[in-house]
Swiss-Prot record:
Keyword flag Transcription: no
InterPro entries associated with the record: ExoRNase_PH_dom1 (IPR001247), ExoRNase_PH_dom2 (IPR015847), ExoRNase_PH_dom2_sf (IPR036345), KH_dom (IPR004087), KH_dom_type_1 (IPR004088), KH_dom_type_1_sf (IPR036612), NA-bd_OB-fold (IPR012340), PNPase (IPR012162)
Enzyme class, broadest EC rank: transferase
Name of the featured protein: Polyribonucleotide nucleotidyltransferase
Cofactors: Mg(2+)
GO biological process, one term: mRNA catabolic process
GO CC annotation terms, alphabetical: cytosol
Entry keyword set: Cytoplasm, Magnesium, Metal-binding, Nucleotidyltransferase, RNA-binding, Transferase
Gene designation per UniProt: pnp
Record-annotated KH domain positions: 554-613
MF annotations from Gene Ontology: 3'-5'-RNA exonuclease activity; magnesium ion binding; polyribonucleotide nucleotidyltransferase activity; RNA binding
Residue ranges occupied by any S1 motif domain in the UniProt entry: 623-691
Length: 722
């Protein structure tokens, strides 16, 4: 007799066998589900407080996705040998899970909810993000917490004209698309993707395909709920105080309508704050007022005003129609000593973007569960509080900044040159200096221009545009290049980035159900129109990549040596390569296949380092004349160094055409002579001749007191061969 009441559901999902179970582990949580997809095992748990905190004004949902190194059979690095702060990858997956879950909690539900997902076992070929999202959704579904789920999710690839369901990492390597879609049985809620310049039709088809395929997971979750679900919470939203709403509306609606005729963001924000203060003051004359309730009512009035204006065909907040992109200004090369820079301004959104070139040593080393790998392209997004005219914390990046940076990176990856064509590592940093919507897409545009300014041979210009949607029954309006307020008050925000040939990144967040395939089709077509307009502005500002790198960027040269020679270049304990680096001022990297990359801002230093490495690794050629010092005198000849680490024997009989009695009569240690390589045996022993070199080049050698002097009639310049 077991103490556990387990419920297990198994199903085939594409090429994967999936198992969901609950009732054995984490029984004190509100809900816990373990999902196993071909040995990638994750545990999703949820706990919610039974009541909201007094004065709570927002829904406090937190989602934490945590990877445990034991899942991959590893012990963590570092002094403490335990997991530390979440990695960038963990943060991104936490956001990925949060986005489709958040809209499904009912309005007015302000209880704290915490979703925690642990990765317990990892199959390196099966990514853990989709299992994690399924586990979180299932845990919420069985918990009884008010939640309009369950949510399903699917990864979609695209290869050879066919969509792939939940491709493995091996399959992803040849896929032109990496798209994750999440939603309910009825509607899509979230899309995140990276694509290789695919058409709008292919992208929309992938979204629809993914939504169809996720129904298998949703049905399995519903079956699990039927068998093991907890009773639904007895929760209802607090009834609305209609008389109070009417009172606030009477005070605020007219001045708010007036405020939304102000086109400039700063002036409009000041006016809205002023109206809020005035309304609060008038209400407080009649007694105590719940500030949270008043702010909620004011938000609803603002949403009604803005949405109705747009749906009625009136101008938007800043005076534009639904299809117009804000004015764009672009300036390249704005910073004198950076490798590449661009200032991209679109209306009241501005990004100062800087590109920096580095060597292989500058690549980011990522120690992921599935194994360590290196990333040669980094994109970092920063938005300080002054960008919106506010004060606030400045420090390490927040989740939003990490997410925006990854979106911009996804948009630019498809146009980057290969490492073979451009050996540099690249870091792009977007500093948002002004923000009124669409700052991540401004970062895409600025990032592309900054790389072009740095001389990175990108395959095409990439532009991004943020779109919005207002939906009311059968009426809808798609908005191009949305403002911050339009994002806040709208029903969908989606960002599309790409080239003139197709989409490279698509991110979509939908706050309501009822958005159809036809609406998404209209939205994507309008986004393409906006993207092409922005691309034309970018091409006007910078038509092609700079042909010359910045004077402050490192120059690089790559060449091959025989892998067997690597240890000679490195030297004992790294002594040789360290000396080379110090003496030439160059950065030198050697790969296991013998590829040597030298980087330096000095052309002379780079040339010297290359020559010295070639000297160290050079093979002696029979018949070639070399110049080198006499390193040791012997009774029967002398040892002469002709290449780094390579000494040859100059026999006494090969010193002169005349009979030589004593070697020291003709040669001295340290004396530089020119000798011809006569032969090299299998053991690498070299036989040299001074008289043969003299015969080829002209000249004589005569005995001197203490040392010999070479008399060359027209001795060739040092380093030349016959």
């Amino acid at each position: 007799m077991t103490m556990f009441k387990k419920a297990v559901k198994s199903f085939q999902w594409g090429n994967h066998q999936v198992t969901m179970e609950t009732g054995e582990i984490a029984r004190q949580s509100g809900g816990a589900v373990i999902v196993n997809v071909d040995d990638t095992v994750v545990m999703g748990t949820v706990v919610a407080s039974k009541s909201a905190k007094p004065g709570q004004s927002f829904f406090p949902l937190t989602v934490d996705y945590l990877e445990k190194t034991y899942a991959a059979g590893k012990i963590p690095g570092g002094f403490f040998r335990r997991e530390g702060r979440p990695s960038e990858g963990e943060t991104l997956i936490s956001r990925l899970i949060d986005r489709p879950l958040r809209p499904l909690f009912p309005e007015g539900f302000l209880n704290e909810v915490q979703v925690v997902i642990h990765v317990l076992s990892i199959n390196p070929d099966v990514p853990s993000d989709i299992p994690a999202l399924i586990a979180a959704s299932a845990a919420l579904a069985i918990s009884g917490i008010p939640f309009a789920g369950p949510v399903g999710a699917a990864r979609v690839g695209y290869a050879n004209g066919q969509y792939l369901l939940n491709p493995t990492r091996t399959e992803q390597a040849t896929s032109e698309l990496d798209l994750i879609v999440a939603g309910t049985q009825a509607a899509v809620l979230m899309v995140e993707s990276e694509a290789n310049q695919l058409s709008e039709e292919v992208m929309l088809g992938a979204v629809v395909y993914g939504h169809d395929q996720m129904q298998t997971a949703i049905n399995a979750i519903n079956e699990l709920v039927a068998e093991a679900g907890k009773p639904e919470w007895d929760w209802t939203a607090a009834p609305k105080d209609e008389p109070f709403i009417a009172k606030v509306t009477a005070l605020a609606e007219a001045p708010l309508r007036e405020a939304y005729q102000i086109r400039q963001k700063g002036a409009r924000s000041d006016k809205l704050k002023e109206i809020t203060k005035e309304v609060m003051a008038k209400l407080q004359e009649e007694g105590d007022v719940d500030a949270v309730a008043v702010n909620d009512i004011l938000f609803e009035i603002e949403a009604k005003i803005v949405r109705s204006q747009i749906l009625n065909g009136e101008p938007r907040i800043d005076g534009r129609d639904t299809r117009t992109v804000r004015p764009i200004e672009i300036r390249n090369g704005v910073l004198p000593r950076t490798h590449g820079s661009a200032l991209f301004t679109r209306g009241e959104t501005q990004a100062l973007v800087v590109a920096t070139l580095g060597t292989a040593r500058d690549e980011q080393i990522i120690d992921a569960l599935e194994g360590e790998y290196r990333d040669r392209f980094m994109f970092h997004y920063n938005m300080p509080p002054f960008a919106t005219g506010e004060t606030g914390r400045v420090g390490s990046p927040k989740r939003r900044e990490i997410g925006h940076g990854r979106l911009a990176k996804r948009a630019l990856i498809p146009v980057l040159p290969s490492a073979e064509d451009f050996a540099y590592s690249i870091r792009v940093v977007s500093e948002i200096t002004e923000s009124n919507g669409s700052s991540s897409m401004a970062s895409v545009c600025g990032g592309c221009l900054a790389m072009m300014d740095a001389g990175v041979p990108v395959k095409a210009h990439v532009a991004g545009v943020a779109m919005g949607l207002i939906l009311d029954g059968n009426r809808f309006a798609v908005l191009t290049d949305i403002l911050g307020d339009e994002d806040h008050l709208g029903d969908m925000d989606f960002k599309v980035a790409g080239t003139a040939n197709g989409i490279t990144a698509l991110q979509m967040d939908i706050k309501v159900q009822g958005i159809t395939k036809e609406i998404m089709q209209v939205a994507l077509a309008q986004a393409k129109e906006g993207r092409l307009h922005i691309l034309s502005k970018m091409q006007e500002a910078m038509g092609s990549v700079r042909t010359e790198l910045s004077a402050h960027a490192p120059r690089m040269v790559s060449f091959k040596i025989h892998p067997d020679k690597i240890r000679e270049v490195i030297g004992k304990g790294g002594a040789t390569i360290q000396a080379l680096t110090k003496e030439t001022g160059c950065s030198i990297d050697i790969k296991d296949d013998g590829t040597v990359t030298i980087a330096s801002t000095s052309a002379e230093g780079m040339a010297e380092a290359k020559a010295r490495i070639e000297g160290i690794t050079a093979e002696a050629e029979v018949g070639k004349i070399y110049e080198g010092p006499v390193v040791k005198l012997l009774e029967f000849g002398a040892l002469v160094n002709i290449l780094p680490g390579k000494d040859g024997l100059l026999h006494i009989s090969e010193i002169s055409n005349e009979r030589v009695k004593e070697v020291k009569d003709y040669l001295a240690e340290g004396q530089v002579v020119r000798v011809k390589l006569l032969a090299a045996d299998e053991r690498g022993r070299l036989r040299l001749s001074l008289k043969a070199a003299m015969a080829d080049e002209g000249g004589t050698i005569a005995p001197l007191a203490g040392a010999a002097e070479v008399v060359a009639e027209e001795a060739p310049a040092s380093g030349e061969s016959a």
